[in-house]
Amino acid sequence: MASNSIKIFAGNSHPELAEKVARRIGLSLGKVAVVQYSNRETSVTIGESVRDEDVFILQTGCGSINDHLMELLIMINACRSASARRITAIIPCFPYARQDKKDKSRAPITARLVANMLQTAGCNHIITMDLHASQIQGFFNVPVDNLYAEPSVLRYIRENIDTTVNPTVIVSPDAGGAKRATALADRLDLDFALIHKERQKANEVSRMVLVGDVRDKLAILVDDMADTCGTLGLAAKTLKDNGAKAVYAIVTHGILSGKAIKVINESALEKVIVTNTIPHDDKRSLCSKIETIDISGVLAECIRRIHHGESVSVLFSVAPA
């Protein structure tokens, strides 16, 4: 058993999630003061000793992403300078995860740059969830635990949707998410369908083609990320046009930027279920279709297991209560 104690600090991106995680472990959040000067520089002061402690810093990729990323880097570096034994960054929604490859001439691989910056700042370990591209783990020279929302999603479906009464089909909104959707369908013993989408430019889908049978069924769209929700809106229309009785969407990272709320409200989607890797309270007040799955239990159990040197692989298949 580790002799050093756990210290959990929260950045400004998602203090509510950090508070839930700390409460589940039976701790209070560590004292930290983050100040932004009039010239937009960020200053961080760690308000308690972290010498020889096991430090966890929670900061997710949302809102003012660049400010939050810099804040995280400074917090990590401050803890390293204060002689923390180990520093783990908990980044539920990893920033710049969609910039993971050189997909056109002179394009930067920004996800790798973020990985390098985190390590240079002094990070010893990364916890994240449903990376948009799993190969991002290879950008790090420190351990990365990429947790899955799937166990929590399975629990939500089993507790809230009676698939024996309502014939249900799991749908991937694109070919890239087929593996995720088929894994979920297999564990629930449900049918699977796929939507092929053609893009003319980023965030805009021009045409969708359905592969599979959704007629008279509840169709559940499953994806790792929903940004402007253009894909989900068009996918829901495609499913309804092909006879689906109702359409839900379950998404790990509900970024919901731009006109996303307007798109959801005007779409054929009856529910959009997102995890709380990103805060949604302001969005939920504008859209009654949005529901939230709490993943604080997964993060808390991961922290406990890492601190005590236990395996975290059980969290890939079971969601803590």
From Swiss-Prot:
The keyword ATP-binding applies. It is found in: Cytoplasm. One of its GO terms (molecular function) is ATP binding. GO terms for biological process: 5-phosphoribose 1-diphosphate biosynthetic process; purine nucleotide biosynthetic process; ribonucleoside monophosphate biosynthetic process. One of its GO terms (cellular component) is cytosol. Keywords: ATP-binding, Cytoplasm, Kinase, Magnesium, Metal-binding, Nucleotide biosynthesis, Nucleotide-binding, Phosphoprotein, Transferase. Mg(2+) binds at D130, H132, D145. Pathway: Metabolic intermediate biosynthesis; 5-phospho-alpha-D-ribose 1-diphosphate biosynthesis; 5-phospho-alpha-D-ribose 1-diphosphate from D-ribose 5-phosphate (route I): step 1/1. SUPFAM superfamilies: PRTase-like. Its EC number is 2.7.6.1. The modification Phosphoserine is found at S172. Its main location: cytoplasm. It catalyses: D-ribose 5-phosphate + ATP = 5-phospho-alpha-D-ribose 1-diphosphate + AMP + H(+). It is an enzyme of class 2 (transferase). Belongs to the ribose-phosphate pyrophosphokinase family. PANTHER family: RIBOSE-PHOSPHATE DIPHOSPHOKINASE FAMILY MEMBER (PTHR10210), RIBOSE-PHOSPHATE PYROPHOSPHOKINASE 2 (PTHR10210:SF32). 5-phosphoribose 1-diphosphate synthase involved in nucleotide, histidine, and tryptophan biosynthesis. Active in heteromultimeric complexes with other 5-phosphoribose 1-diphosphate synthases. This is Ribose-phosphate pyrophosphokinase 2. It comes from Schizosaccharomyces pombe (strain 972 / ATCC 24843).
